[in-house]
Amino acid sequence: MTDLHRLSVRELAEGLGQAQFSSRELTQHYLNRIDKIDAQVKSYVTVTHEQALAQADAADALRQAGNAGFLTGVPLAHKDIFCTKGIKTTAGSKMLDNFISPYNATVVEKANAAGLVTLGKLNMDEFAMGSTSESSYFGATCNPWALDRVPGGSSGGSAAAVAADLAPFATGTDTGGSIRQPASFCGLTGLKPTYGRVSRFGMIAYASSLDQGGPMARSAEDCAYLMNVMAGHDAKDSTSVKKDVDDYVANLNATALKGLRIGIPKQYFNVAGLDAEVKARVEESLKKLEEMGAVLVEIDLSMTESYVPTYYLIAPAEASSNLSRYDGVRYGYRCENPVDLMDLYKRSRSEGFGAEVQRRILIGTYALSAGYYDAYYVKAQKVRRLIQQDFLKAFENVDVIAAPSAPTTAYKIGADLTPVEMYLGDIYTLAVNLAGLPAINAPVGLDSNNLPVGLQLIGNYWSESQLLSIVHQYQQDTTFHTQRAAIAEENA
């Protein structure tokens, strides 16, 4: 079959179960596409040809023995922030260019246990710090919809790989929008779960109180299959929550749209910089949900203007602490011929970290310094609590909250944006991480440049099933999630 990459995750799993094709054939099909197309997209940092085929053969043997799970033999790819035993894990940085993890991240372990086949590791902004995937030491990833545009970030490689049909689904991480914004830019469905729902063990840390792993795929149904694999308590992660996990696939039609109250924050649709076409597509999608039975309710989120300054104090502060371990002594990049220990530290970090990572470490170190700790970091944590309370108050009257996922569609690679302009592009996504809430991006149309627009739905704690169900039902009645990027259509 030449069009295996056009099938959904469910169709791939059913095809394997019915012996329409083998996991080896399916895996080889994707590897061939990667070899053919990815030189243009640059979504993969590492392609694991031999290991993938070995995993596929093992999956086929399990099926023949009658011991396979539903997803056994389906391929996926991991963001290069999840540790993979025996495979390079770089976090997109020169600092970890030669790091081979001695263990698997829990997310990778769960994927392996489900019989999923790892195609490789996906490009990302360095240490997940960025919104474009341009800060990667391995070069910028291109948006499959327009190769001169960014795919978003930091999970840009994950989004680009799925959008170009170089993987059926992929893992991502989200610290301030790093699943939802690239999903929006690349026309995908992407879910950021409640903080603590997915294990962070073996996931290289950026900002520990904000980071959360999640799935990226074409549809809510495909995301639900990967969430069933990823979610759950992990004793190795002290922030993982002991709470029963839903069957996200079984619950895809469980949420009634009739009477569902969707909050429309008046502040969100009056943000300076919100593109008129993005606003129009999002409003059209909300009208469609209204036609399907939902009720739109205007709400007030008075803390909106505090999102960006609060996030860009807390996240860099945590990054400053987390990245202090990369000193050129124990592991990571080490400079050549240091004069003394201080020179080793300074040069290893200056040469090993890129400009954006250095910028955030400096901001974070300043915010944590003795004279400014109370004025900046402690105050930001107090405002963070107010942001959380703002959301909880809103959820007393509505079931979910709607917003654009990003104020614009994908911009040009190399666009002359200042760091502040780049940070303001995260206005709609940051608060979800500050509050620890779940949120999902759904593709809802294209702009006049044929670039995807995304709708973000924010849920109350532990409402991942509800979010997936709403988007799934929307996708049963629309075709935006089935539209394919130019490079995927050209190489169908």
UniProtKB/Swiss-Prot annotation:
It comes from the Bacteria. GO terms for molecular function: ATP binding; glutaminyl-tRNA synthase (glutamine-hydrolyzing) activity. Its EC number is 6.3.5.7. GO terms for biological process: translation. GO terms for cellular component: glutamyl-tRNA(Gln) amidotransferase complex. It catalyses: L-glutamyl-tRNA(Gln) + L-glutamine + ATP + H2O = L-glutaminyl-tRNA(Gln) + L-glutamate + ADP + phosphate + H(+). The active site is at residues 79, 154, 178. Keywords: ATP-binding, Ligase, Nucleotide-binding, Protein biosynthesis. It is an enzyme of class 6 (ligase). The keyword Protein biosynthesis applies. SUPFAM superfamilies: Amidase signature (AS) enzymes. NCBIfam families: gatA (TIGR00132). Heterotrimer of A, B and C subunits. Belongs to the amidase family. GatA subfamily. Allows the formation of correctly charged Gln-tRNA(Gln) through the transamidation of misacylated Glu-tRNA(Gln) in organisms which lack glutaminyl-tRNA synthetase. The reaction takes place in the presence of glutamine and ATP through an activated gamma-phospho-Glu-tRNA(Gln). This is Glutamyl-tRNA(Gln) amidotransferase subunit A. It comes from Acinetobacter baylyi (strain ATCC 33305 / BD413 / ADP1). The gene is gatA.
